[in-house]
């Protein structure tokens, strides 16, 4: 801009009569907008854009934001120049030489626009304003996912309530066996749950009508939260749209409100917990997975009076590992921390009434400060919740945006969830049949060398170790054997530990289904030459050990 001014000063009445300091103050959006209307000067403007000058916000520079004044019209008037509103400035010929000289100014590489900024402005808008190429950016982000084999493909799986574990694909006439659903106990298709939901819809309709604060609070929410509080032996509970939201909203709210709070988080925690801690903007310390020595060392390094939250899970969904809950509670008490326990992959399946792993040790439920769970897995519906003290629950209810500003769950969903929770408080049939199916599948796969990561839970991780191979194995099972098992890749699991995650349900506890899966897995492992048990044992990975679940007789119905 300085070069243009100097070259034009000898000829242009506008430039020669204007105050130099005023021109400098205008060397931004005001002058550029006017120049863009000039058929000569506008050709020099892309050079100014390439130098990175900030002309988009009415400021002189990036480093020192000074409002630009006076306007171009004011300077024209002071210089005695008229007809400034015409599309062609009357002094355009005089400034043409300067403009052409400016267009020849070389642009160094460091000043070139990023590739996501379009260089062809097609004459629309100020010539100095680059356009961000959104679609190119989106494509490049997706290309990264394709290159590292972490791109997610959705399979069209339509589970059939009256034929489970069967489902159909896009064609309703097809049938495939579903072996990876999180409807762990088949409660989503349970006759009692379906009938309760149908009846509720007939009476109350399909939607909630609003947030809990505005028209969305009802007797169904009250009853469900009372039942969940009773399940976990807590004074209160609060229901959310999902357990992802429950974890995120609760952790972020606690972290923002507790003064100088610090989180201690297991390195294998779910993304919802990681995100909640991140959103709290609190300090965090990651401790080694299920490592009590590492956790205690980190706790001991902190002041006793500083608020601390230990966040961990009971059953880790991709490995089946179980946390040492009692010992973590001991450390929390010793070092003045509170515990946040995610029982998402345990509620319904563990404990005498389905309250989770903590319920299996007498007296342990009362020692855990905050328990979170889901209504979308063992209970076969949708939603999440927390259970804790009345004051903590009321604080989250009153302060958590993730609870306050979202529509409540529909009445029929809460009725279905309540029916499932109450049913599993008294029925062990589903739990026993599921455990028998899990034991049979693990034993059958082990006998043919399929490397199942050892654990004593319902999770059956068949290890593959390569993202591309895992996808091929999953596709082959589906298309060649009518068996659906989703491949699990990074970032859900670490690179090199890709797997197929199998989750047997009570409906799989038949000789037909167990043998069908075993034969298909054996064929696929041979087809793609995937490592079996011995290959993983050489890497020091514990695979193939049988779980402790008891075996029941096969069921004879689906």
From Swiss-Prot:
<dbReference type="InterPro" id="IPR015422">
    <property type="entry name" value="PyrdxlP-dep_Trfase_small"/>
</dbReference>
<feature type="transit peptide" description="Mitochondrion">
    <location>
        <begin position="1"/>
        <end position="25"/>
    </location>
</feature>
<dbReference type="GO" id="GO:0003870">
    <property type="term" value="F:5-aminolevulinate synthase activity"/>
</dbReference>
<feature type="region of interest" description="Disordered">
    <location>
        <begin position="103"/>
        <end position="124"/>
    </location>
</feature>
<feature type="binding site" description="in other chain">
    <location>
        <position position="374"/>
    </location>
    <ligand>
        <name>pyridoxal 5'-phosphate</name>
    </ligand>
</feature>
<dbReference type="GO" id="GO:0006783">
    <property type="term" value="P:heme biosynthetic process"/>
</dbReference>
<dbReference type="InterPro" id="IPR015421">
    <property type="entry name" value="PyrdxlP-dep_Trfase_major"/>
</dbReference>
<dbReference type="GO" id="GO:0005759">
    <property type="term" value="C:mitochondrial matrix"/>
</dbReference>
<feature type="binding site">
    <location>
        <position position="284"/>
    </location>
    <ligand>
        <name>substrate</name>
    </ligand>
</feature>
<comment type="similarity">
    <text>Belongs to the class-II pyridoxal-phosphate-dependent aminotransferase family.</text>
</comment>
<feature type="modified residue" description="N6-(pyridoxal phosphate)lysine">
    <location>
        <position position="377"/>
    </location>
</feature>
<dbReference type="GO" id="GO:0030170">
    <property type="term" value="F:pyridoxal phosphate binding"/>
</dbReference>
<dbReference type="GO" id="GO:0008483">
    <property type="term" value="F:transaminase activity"/>
</dbReference>
<feature type="binding site" description="in other chain">
    <location>
        <position position="317"/>
    </location>
    <ligand>
        <name>pyridoxal 5'-phosphate</name>
    </ligand>
</feature>
<dbReference type="GO" id="GO:0006782">
    <property type="term" value="P:protoporphyrinogen IX biosynthetic process"/>
</dbReference>
<dbReference type="InterPro" id="IPR015424">
    <property type="entry name" value="PyrdxlP-dep_Trfase"/>
</dbReference>
<dbReference type="InterPro" id="IPR010961">
    <property type="entry name" value="4pyrrol_synth_NH2levulA_synth"/>
</dbReference>
<feature type="binding site">
    <location>
        <position position="265"/>
    </location>
    <ligand>
        <name>substrate</name>
    </ligand>
</feature>
<keyword id="KW-0809">Transit peptide</keyword>
<keyword id="KW-0350">Heme biosynthesis</keyword>
<dbReference type="InterPro" id="IPR004839">
    <property type="entry name" value="Aminotransferase_I/II_large"/>
</dbReference>
<dbReference type="InterPro" id="IPR001917">
    <property type="entry name" value="Aminotrans_II_pyridoxalP_BS"/>
</dbReference>
<feature type="binding site">
    <location>
        <position position="407"/>
    </location>
    <ligand>
        <name>pyridoxal 5'-phosphate</name>
    </ligand>
</feature>
<protein>
    <recommendedName>
        <fullName>5-aminolevulinate synthase, mitochondrial</fullName>
        <ecNumber>2.3.1.37</ecNumber>
    </recommendedName>
</protein>
<keyword id="KW-0012">Acyltransferase</keyword>
<keyword id="KW-0496">Mitochondrion</keyword>
<comment type="subunit">
    <text>Homodimer.</text>
</comment>
<dbReference type="InterPro" id="IPR050087">
    <property type="entry name" value="AON_synthase_class-II"/>
</dbReference>
<keyword id="KW-0808">Transferase</keyword>
<comment type="pathway">
    <text>Porphyrin-containing compound metabolism; protoporphyrin-IX biosynthesis; 5-aminolevulinate from glycine: step 1/1.</text>
</comment>
<dbReference type="Pfam" id="PF00155">
    <property type="entry name" value="Aminotran_1_2"/>
</dbReference>
<feature type="binding site">
    <location>
        <position position="492"/>
    </location>
    <ligand>
        <name>substrate</name>
    </ligand>
</feature>
<feature type="binding site">
    <location>
        <position position="406"/>
    </location>
    <ligand>
        <name>pyridoxal 5'-phosphate</name>
    </ligand>
</feature>
<keyword id="KW-0663">Pyridoxal phosphate</keyword>
<feature type="binding site" description="in other chain">
    <location>
        <position position="345"/>
    </location>
    <ligand>
        <name>pyridoxal 5'-phosphate</name>
    </ligand>
</feature>
<feature type="binding site">
    <location>
        <position position="152"/>
    </location>
    <ligand>
        <name>substrate</name>
    </ligand>
</feature>
<feature type="active site">
    <location>
        <position position="377"/>
    </location>
</feature>
<comment type="function">
    <text>Catalyzes the synthesis of 5-aminolevulinate (ALA) from succinyl-CoA and glycine, the first and rate-limiting step in heme biosynthesis.</text>
</comment>
<dbReference type="GO" id="GO:0005739">
    <property type="term" value="C:mitochondrion"/>
</dbReference>
